Design a protein with these regions (language model features):
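ATP-dependent carboxylate-amine ligase catalytic core
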Residues: 2-111, 119-142, 155-159
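A short helix->loop->beta-strand "cap" motif at the edges of active sites that frequently abuts
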Residues: 113, 169, 313-317
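Internal gly/pro-rich beta-alpha loop/helix module
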Residues: 125-233
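Amide-donor transfer/coupling interface in amidating biosynthetic enzymes
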Residues: 182-230, 234-238, 349-434
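Phosphate-binding active sites in nucleotide-utilizing proteins
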Residues: 239-313
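Cysteine-nucleophile active-site neighborhood
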Residues: 267, 291-365
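Short, low-complexity intrinsically disordered segments enriched in A/P/G/S/L with frequent Arg
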Residues: 441-442, 463
Length: 466
């Protein structure tokens, strides 16, 4: 067993979503980076958008930590490896500190990382202290560093908030309410980093605001135990995988792409919006993103639509997740009612909704093996296709996402986390496999019968069927 490693670390959490966790985490990352420190940032739970912002802020890749989807050992490995190179580790929580199972608090407690509570101080005075006390004392064994007030109006306002804290609660400072440092959002969350031309200006402004009003010394070092290291097998040696990546398709986990490379795959990125043909590839990966914002442009690229149809007709592997699946349908209609005809490999149509349609962790038993991931979308899909499998939410949700298969094409609303089962992922992308697996029926029963141990942790809202 390798020795443990030590690195200053803190987990940034809040009483609820929308309190400004990402803004504060990004500001801290940019501040310490500007001071010459190497900062590694992680995000609790499934998320694609926050990590884009945090990568720009820190200048380093951002990975997920999660006790169920990622797993304890993989989370331990990521932290242990980061501790070898970083001067500071920041972990942004998800939802409220104690929300969900697993929660941000579960992760902080398990790895001994102290929590910095971020509380939106808007229209609040003494109640701030009550909220801070609740965060600190609700679970007595939770390491708690202190609190930081966000969106504070004036210096006097900040003094009122600080004065409301009970003895023993540490005040880290206050971040003012400035539009120049807030991060804009849309229906799936924050606007993608690549779409914000002034993002670096916002991050530097937030870092400067923190430096002038908050305590920014490094937190105490945390001991991170060494994991059990398992080397990836070269199951995809020499396999060329074309990966869609542009403003319509950008929702990929860094750990998933790392795994494909570690198994020997060669990744070739392309744009379904701008490119007219696919790269020379054995397999195709269409991840999620915002196809609904670009569906007209996607529909107008007839050459790319034909290239994807030809890839499938040649019997080559194709994996499509969420937005990637919508792209493969006959049509996609946005919230304004504008309809665009797309690839047409999956018979059906999707319509965007103004409200959230599904949010949940998912465990899926495919013919290739069990995979874990999550679902999060604002569309509803109508199709007569028969699924080969349905996901199960680990907390026993009232619905589950379907997985569809036509030949070597696999499509679902589920965003799969590839390291949850490298062998199954390799089978999805490897060319030349027997196609008999495509016709296997969906398994029945609960997570135990599907080979996925019933976790003591689950998460999220129940998913709705497509």
């Amino acid at each position: 067993m390798k020795p443990p490693r030590h690195c200053p670390a803190v987990l940034i959490a809040a009483p609820a979503s929308g309190q400004g966790k990402t803004t504060v985490t990004a500001a801290l990352a940019r501040l310490h980076r500007n001071q010459g420190r190497k900062v590694r940032v992680f995000k609790c739970g499934p998320d694609f958008l926050d990590p884009m912002i945090l990568e720009r802020a820190s200048g380093a890749p951002v990975y997920q930590l999660d006790m169920w989807m990622v797993g304890e050992q993989e989370s331990r490995r990521l932290l242990w490896e980061a501790a070898a190179e970083a001067d500071l580790i920041l972990i942004e929580g998800v939802m409220g500190l104690f929300d969900g199972t697993p929660s941000s608090a579960d992760l902080a407690r398990h790895f001994g990382v102290p929590v910095l509570g971020v509380i939106d101080g808007t229209a609040m005075a003494q109640t701030f202290g009550a909220l801070a006390l609740g965060l600190a004392k609700y679970q007595p064994d939770l390491p708690f560093a202190g609190v930081l007030a966000n969106r504070v109006g004036t210096l006097r306002h900040a003094q009122l908030l600080e004065g409301s804290l009970t003895e023993g609660l540490r005040w880290y400072g206050a971040l003012s309410r400035e539009t120049g440092i807030e991060l804009p959002s849309r229906h799936l969350g924050l606007v993608q980093a690549s779409e914000l031309n002034d993002l670096d200006l916002r991050l530097d402004a937030a870092a400067d605001a923190l430096a002038s009003s908050c305590e920014v010394a490094l937190p105490p070092a945390v001991e991170f135990a060494a994991p059990d290291l398992i080397a990836a097998e070269p199951l995809l040696k020499g396999v060329r995988i074309a990966v869609a990546r542009d403003e319509a398709f950008a929702f990929t986990y860094g750990a998933s792409l790392d795994l494909l490379r570690a198994m020997g795959a060669e990744l070739q990125f392309f744009s379904p919006i701008r490119d007219t043909r696919l790269p020379e590839a054995d397999s195709l990966y269409l991840p999620g993103g915002y196809p609904e914002l670009h569906h007209v442009a996607l529909a107008q690229n007839a050459s790319m639509l034909a290239a994807i149809r030809a890839h499938h007709a040649a019997g080559k592997p194709l994996l499509a997740e969420c937005g990637g699946m919508l792209y493969l349908l006959d049509s996609l209609t946005d919230v304004e009612g504008t309809r665009a005809e797309l690839v047409g490999l999956l018979k059906g149509e999707a319509v965007m909704q103004k409200r959230l349609a599904a949010l949940a962790l998912q465990a899926v038993e495919l013919p290739e093996g069990s995979l874990r991931g999550h679902t999060y979308h604002h569309s509803l899909t109508t199709t007569e296709l028969t699924p080969i499998a349905r996901g199960l939410s680990p907390n026993g949700g009232r619905g589950a996402e379907a997985v569809y298969r036509e030949g070597r094409m696999t499509a679902s609303y589920v965003h799969f986390y590839f390291p949850s089962n490298p062998v199954a992922v390799a089978a999805l992308f490897a060319p030349g496999l027997e196609t008999a697996i495509a016709g296997k029926p969906a398994p029945t029963g609960d997570c135990v019968s599907s080979g996925i141990a019933p976790p003591t942790v689950g998460a999220g809202l129940p998913a709705m069927g497509p």
